[in-house]
Curated annotation (Swiss-Prot):
Descriptive protein name: 2-C-methyl-D-erythritol 4-phosphate cytidylyltransferase
Single GO molecular function: 2-C-methyl-D-erythritol 4-phosphate cytidylyltransferase activity
Catalytic activity: 2-C-methyl-D-erythritol 4-phosphate + CTP + H(+) = 4-CDP-2-C-methyl-D-erythritol + diphosphate
Site (Positions MEP for the nucleophilic attack): 163, 219
First-level EC class: transferase
Record bears the keyword Magnesium: no
CDD domains: CDP-ME_synthetase (cd02516)
Pathway annotation: Isoprenoid biosynthesis; isopentenyl diphosphate biosynthesis via DXP pathway; isopentenyl diphosphate from 1-deoxy-D-xylulose 5-phosphate: step 2/6
GO biological process: isopentenyl diphosphate biosynthetic process, methylerythritol 4-phosphate pathway
Entry-linked PANTHER family: 2-C-METHYL-D-ERYTHRITOL 4-PHOSPHATE CYTIDYLYLTRANSFERASE, CHLOROPLASTIC
Protein family: Belongs to the IspD/TarI cytidylyltransferase family. IspD subfamily.
Taxonomic path: Bacteria, Pseudomonadati, Pseudomonadota, Gammaproteobacteria, Oceanospirillales
Organism annotation: Hahella chejuensis (strain KCTC 2396)
Site features described as Transition state stabilizer, chain residue numbers: 23, 30
Length: 241
């Protein structure tokens, strides 16, 4: 069984949640907005903790986060909060450095967006299964289906971009502990623009593996995303029953 083979290298899980979600509007960050019966953050944490092989999560939070204490007790021993940074990459790096003294360089780190509660447990299991014996790791994504245009600064179309081998990058993303720690540290030192963990790994000349997931694993970014996420999440949870 695959889960049994995970004993050789430990899996560490990080959910960066220090963002303020300015595009959603309002005072409450998007991860604390209600989705069905609980917050977006709670759905994400609860679903991750129900996945095989995941028993603990590191959660980088904004220093002035006043909402986490309201729900922290239910995650005692399961979720460890750490100081988040202004950038996602800084938050993940802070968590890695918190873990560093306990981790081996060949351990795995799985990073997931807090605002993506609509993932499938089966997709995480598939990601782990396909990447477990690879270097340096990879990520979930879906092939680009829409026609893609390149424009100039005026919005005028310059060209139609071929969709061949183009993917939309999602999370979770999973990489070897040592490789990700080194990539984020060097990226920070060199001022590299890091949009996700895969981009940090790519900047090191390494080639992450893309694993196909589902397009309904959306990131809640704008107000109109919440009702759509509710539809997707209800359907996914029903499928998983």
């Amino acid at each position: 069984m695959f889960v049994d083979s995970m004993e050789e290298h430990k899996l560490w899980v990080i959910v960066p949640a220090a963002g303020v979600g300015s595009r959603m509007g309002g005072e409450r960050p998007k991860q604390y907005l209600k989705l069905i019966d609980r917050s977006v953050l709670e759905h994400t944490l609860d679903r991750l903790l129900s996945a095989p092989g995941i028993s603990q999560i590191y959660l980088p939070l904004h220093p002035q986060d006043k909402w986490w204490p309201e729900i922290a007790d239910k995650y005692t021993g399961k979720v460890i909060s750490v100081a988040g940074g202004e950038e996602r990459s800084t938050s993940v790096l802070n968590a890695l450095e918190k873990i560093e003294s306990h981790a081996a360089i060949e351990d795995w780190v799985l990073v997931h967006d807090v605002a993506r509660p609509c993932f499938r447990i089966s997709d995480i299991s598939n990601l782990m299964r396909l990447l477990w014996n690879t270097q340096p790791g990879g990520l979930l994504g879906v092939p680009v289906a829409d026609t893609v245009k390149r424009t100039n600064e005026k919005g005028e179309v310059l060209a139609t971009v071929s969709r061949a081998n183009l993917w939309r990058a999602y999370t979770p993303q999973m990489f070897r502990f040592g490789a990700l720690l080194s990539a984020l540290r060097q990226g920070s030192e060199k001022g590299v623009h890091i949009t996700d963990e895969a981009s940090a790994i790519e900047a090191q000349g390494l080639k992450p593996v893309m694993v196909e997931g589902h397009s309904d694993n959306i990131k809640i970014t704008h107000p109109q995303d919440l009702p759509l996420a509710e539809i997707f999440l209800r359907r996914i949870m029903q499928e998983e029953e």
